[in-house]
């Protein structure tokens, strides 16, 4: 049975459980965990692995040029950027309300970095994101709602 359990977990596509099974079994034996406590731990391991994989898939599907974060942004670079407004966008409330955001400004002002960073925040909040430069969107014939 010892070898059939990991095989069954993989067949059931429970790779998170399969990865942590041995460690969790030792932990359960050493700490006298109940069956329920043990089951909760390996289920949490599985959920963690699945959430990480889902996050990776969403980041890949977003087609970011680079993964950017708000923590990486140099706020001294462009002091005219309203930090409070950017962090408000990072809450993703505008998405929950079905609103659009259009970034305008000359090249080199931080638009792409901030856009990708907020996109990453949206992915972490569970939204599906697709990054595209404005020139590409307009060349495809799509127009933001604000311009319709």
Language-model-derived ranges and their functions:
Residues 10, 15-66:
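Interdomain "pre-motor" coupling segment immediately N-terminal to P-loop NTPase/helicase cores
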Residues 7, 23-27, 72, 101-104:
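Short hinge/gating elements
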Residues 93, 102-129:
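Walker A/P-loop
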């Amino acid at each position: 049975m010892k070898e059939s359990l990991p095989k069954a977990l993989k067949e059931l596509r429970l790779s998170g459980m399969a990865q942590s099974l041995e460690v969790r079994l030792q932990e359960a034996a050493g700490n006298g965990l109940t069956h329920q406590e043990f089951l909760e731990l390996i289920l949490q391991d599985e959920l963690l692995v699945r959430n990480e994989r889902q996050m990776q898939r969403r980041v890949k599907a977003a087609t970011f040029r680079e993964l950017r974060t708000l923590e990486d942004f140099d706020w001294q670079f462009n002091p005219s950027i309203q930090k409070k407004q950017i962090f408000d966008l990072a809450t993703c409330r505008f998405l929950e309300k079905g609103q659009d955001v259009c970034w305008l400004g000359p090249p080199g002002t931080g638009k792409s970095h901030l856009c990708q960073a907020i996109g990453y925040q949206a992915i972490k909040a569970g939204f599906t994101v697709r990054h595209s430069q404005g020139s590409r969107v307009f060349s495809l014939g799509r127009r933001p709602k604000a311009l319709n």
